[in-house]
């Protein structure tokens, strides 16, 4: 029998490799060697380190759109580690959006892709990031196991 749980942790970005796929207007801005189109989309290959009750690493492939104002993002992440003492791996589907100030996303656990103690886990996490932080970002996961 499954029970509802809520747990939390923090994550930091350990690598970010972003490349433009489409620059609609040919107008981009370069920041720290990365090009960001005014309108278009890119792919970012990213790794995260998690700590707290969610501990481990994540490898993410993002598709990020750029548009003045609201712009959607999506991606898939393979998480390996421990959630509330359950060791294994699972896959999150990231669905979100961003603007000039904030990134918002819901991370859905993809059913059927878990291993070990995380096999059979269902649920979702939410994140809202305002600006860059070297100290990491909070994540709260609601799950059933």
Residue ranges and their predicted role:
Residues 2-145:
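Beta-strand-enriched cores of mature, soluble protein domains
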């Amino acid at each position: 029998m499954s029970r509802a749980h809520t747990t939390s942790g923090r994550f930091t970005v350990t690598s970010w490799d972003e490349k433009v796929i489409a620059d609609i207007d040919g107008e981009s801005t370069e920041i720290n060697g990365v090009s960001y189109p005014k309108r278009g989309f890119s792919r970012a290959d990213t790794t995260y380190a998690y700590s707290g009750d969610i501990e481990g690493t994540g490898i993410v492939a993002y598709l990020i759109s750029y548009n003045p104002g609201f712009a959607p993002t999506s991606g898939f992440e393979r998480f390996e580690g421990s959630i509330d003492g359950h060791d294994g791996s699972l896959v999150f589907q990231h669905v979100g959006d961003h603007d000039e100030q904030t990134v918002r996303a819901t991370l859905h656990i993809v059913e059927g892709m878990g291993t070990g103690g995380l096999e059979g886990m269902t649920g979702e996490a939410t994140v809202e990031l305002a600006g860059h932080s070297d100290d990491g970002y909070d994540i709260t996961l609601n799950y059933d196991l």
